[in-house]
Amino acid sequence: MRITLPSGTECEIDRTVANPKMGLVIAPDIFSLRGLYDVLVKRLANEWQMAVCAVEPFPGKTLGPEIEPRFAAVPELDDDKHLRDLHEAADALGTAEVGLMGFCMGGMYCFKSARSDRFKKIISFYGMITVPDGWKSATQGEPLEFLKNG
């Protein structure tokens, strides 16, 4: 089910499991929320018996299926706003404990989320440990620095 966070960012959420022991926030790859994540959210909720939410990484943008506009949009992303969205998604799950899982660009944001105590466990798949040159900007911190400094 699609919801809108207080920030205005869209998420796919599944809270159908009764009394979940834990919640899971998913940070998608550069291709954003799509059918793949709708299925993944539902599947992980059912198989792992938890509340699950996937967060749109490019809120308010229509980037299309090509990768070039997406690469060009990454420097415009703001680490603080992205972390806020991940926190709001965690709150929407309604569980005391929440993990964070990310894929590729979302995995990089998992590393950047190490500065927060909100997530009990963080799992990054293929996340960049340094910001690629074409993505660097004043609003993009270095993942290794966030991991190092917490």
Where are these regions (language model features)?
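A conserved short beta-strand
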Residues: R118-T130
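A short beta-to-alpha transition loop/helix N-cap that caps and shapes the active-site region
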Residues: K61-P65, I129-W135
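Active-site signature of alpha/beta-hydrolase-fold catalytic machinery across serine-
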Residues: V39, K112-S113
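The feature captures the conserved acid-bearing segment of alpha/beta-hydrolase catalytic domains
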Residues: P132-G150
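Aromatic pocket-lining residues of Rossmann-like dinucleotide-binding sites
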Residues: L44, S113-A114
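Gly/Ala-rich beta-loop-alpha elbow adjacent to hydrolase catalytic centers
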Residues: G102-G106, C110
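Short beta-strand immediately N-terminal to the catalytic nucleophile in serine-hydrolase-like folds
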Residues: L100-G102, F125
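Serine-hydrolase catalytic machinery in alpha/beta-hydrolase-like enzymes
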Residues: M1-G94, P143
